[in-house]
Amino acid sequence: MISPNVETFIGCDSSYRAADIVLYGAPFDSTTSYRPGARFGPSAIRHESFGLETYSPYQNADLTDFDIFDSGDLELCFGSSEAALADIEARAAEILRDGKLPLLLGGEHLVTLGAVRAVAEKHPGLHIIHFDAHADLRDDYLGAKLSHACVLRRCHEIVGDGRIHQFCIRSGERAEFEFAAQHTEMHKFDFTGLAELTEQLCATKEPVYLTIDLDCLDPSCFPGTGTPEAGGVSFLQLLDAIRTVSKANIVGADLNELAPMLDISGVSTATACKVLRELLIALDKGWPGFQVSQKII
C-alpha cells in the first residue's frame, strides 16, 4: 500500500484505502528545451494550496466532501528519461490495480507518457484528450525520441489513429500539423468541439485520459511556464472545459508544466492550485449535485 505524504495538497487527507482519486507527483524536467523549472511545480502547488480554500464556489462543492489521497512525489532519476517514465508507469499501474483514479502532477509534459502506458494497458481502446498550446507531435527533438516536444507522438504509438483529441493548439512545426491532419483530431486555438466530443464519448462509454498542459492558458494569466505562447485561453474557459469533459469516462489524468520560479509574482502557482482544486472536484463522480452543463462564462 502507498504510504501517506507529509505535505499534501489541501483537502486531500483521505486514507489510501478509502480514496477514489490518488494524486502523485513527478518532479521531472530533464528534457525541457527552453526554460527549466517544472520539476519544482508539484511541491510549489502543494505549498501554495494552504492559502486556498477547499470550497469551490464554481462547483458548489468542497474537496473535503470527497475521498482523495495525496501520495507525494516520486523520487525520479533525472539522468534517464526512460527510468523516470518507468517509475511513473509503475506508480500509475499500482493505483489502477487498486481500483482508483491516478492523477499525475508534473513536471514537464513528458511525464504523461509514463502514465498513459499504464492506463492504456489497463483500459484498451483508450482516448486521450489533450489541452495544450503545443502540438507535441514531433517524431524527435534534436535526435531525442523522449522529449516533452514528442510526448503526444509517443502516445499516438500506443493508442493509434483518431484517439488523440487536441485542443487550444497554437504552436508547432508544419510537420506536426500535417501529422495531426492524418492521425489525430486537432482543434486549434480554443475548446471548440469539446462538448460534441464529450457527448460522443459519453455515448460509447470509452475510457478517456485527460492531459492538461497549463500553457494552454494565456501568458497574461499564466506566465510561469517553460514555453509560454500568446493567444491562450482564460482560467474560466479552462475551468468550463474541465467541467465539460469530466462527464466522460475519465480513467486517468494529469496537470503539468508549472515552472514556479519563472513567475516571481506567484500568480501562476496560485492559478495552478485553483485549476487542480477544480479538476479534483470535477473528476470525483461521488457528488450527485454536480451539474457540468451549468456554464460559468
Model-derived features: positions:
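Conserved alpha-helical scaffold segments that buttress catalytic/binding sites
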Residues: 1-297
